[in-house]
Amino acid sequence: MEGFRFLFQARNLCKLGLVFMLASSGAAFAQAKSKQSEVYMYEGADREQRLLEGARKEGMVSIYTSLNLKDSAPITEAFEKKYGIKVSLWRAGGEKVVQRALTEARAGRFTPDVFESDGIEIEILAREKMLAEFKSPVFKELPAEAFPPHRQYVVDRFNFFTIAYNTNLVKPDEVPNSYEDLLQPRWLGKVGIEAGDSDWFGSVVKAMGEKEGLAYFRKLADTRPQVRTGHTLISELVAAGEIPIAATVYNHAVERLTKNGAPIKWKALPPTFGRPGAVAVARNAPHPHAAVLFADFMLSREGQELIKQRNRVPSSKAVDSPLNKFPYRMIDPAIVLDESEKWENLWTDLFLKGKKQAKPSE
């Protein structure tokens, strides 16, 4: 999902009564908790054997994801081949994943076993009591940033915000080494930013110190950057030379273009932030053994290698990736959700409201 644009819609869903309706299903949740938790929290020596035997009896696993099919299908196909467990995969945008899950729960239908989506959507599901904690031996291979305090989901991939530049238009000695370098006169009207990146904005401001951070972004707004919708689009515009440099792209998207011969490179500027994607097991999963087995697979070296093969950034420390070899911090989905209105309003005032884009200088 681009830029968490449905945060206010998610709040509206709650106001319309979905939370109340979910709460009214407390008996179903309590029953599910005692049934599923035994599977989710088991750590005995025969754990893998018990999961596999239970999953084969269950016969399938149902997954709701926002990860696009060209990236998610190879993972589910590998899981089916390894374990012989049928996967039912439903893919949609992150907003629709949340809406469908909440709507089904309101009606007393609990279809998904596993959710895999951007961190903010998974955090919303956690707050709606849709998820449950689980244990896994692969956790030791993951960074501390992969676990929220409530531990009801686990980060399995990152989208790292970096700059990107066209190598035909930007000389090596012109490539910025800091965010301050983007304020140089040569970049007037030439810097691209994605329209929905208020979560990145808020994270960078807080890292700089709110007073200093807001002062910096006011200066950046004065350079009249070119605002576009879609990180993939911005990367493609940089590669095509329509925008010489962009401040908020995903480095894995740039890497794909580079491998295809496009004149584009990325660079991480400190502080570098990653927008997390996460995997979670459903509190009311109809196939709990298969749910944990798939979550294990997604977070294992095998699953993380498959994420890497799709030019995405795996969270595992056990999988080497050229896309995370720099100091980074994770954008906290809980903070984004709690503070979204503040940062969305500031972002809109600075970069979206009544702004005229400058024509790039020659």
PLM regions and their residue ranges:
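Short amphipathic alpha-helical coupling segments at ligand-binding clamshell hinges
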Residues: I75, E212, Y216-K219, P286-M298, ...
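A bilobed periplasmic-binding-protein/Venus flytrap-type ligand-binding module shared by bacterial periplasmic
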Residues: T162-L169, V205-A207, R275-A290, L306
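Periplasmic-binding protein-like
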Residues: E141-A144, F158-F160, W187-G196, F217-A221, P225-R228, M298-V319, ...
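Short, polar/charged alpha-helical segment
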Residues: A45-R56, M60-S62, S66-K86, I163, ...
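Extracytoplasmic ligand-binding site segments that recognize negatively charged/polar headgroups
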Residues: S62-T76, S88-I243
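A ligand-binding cleft/hinge motif common to bilobed small-molecule-binding domains
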Residues: E121-I124, P244-P263
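Extracellular/periplasmic bilobal clamshell ligand-binding domains
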Residues: S321-E362
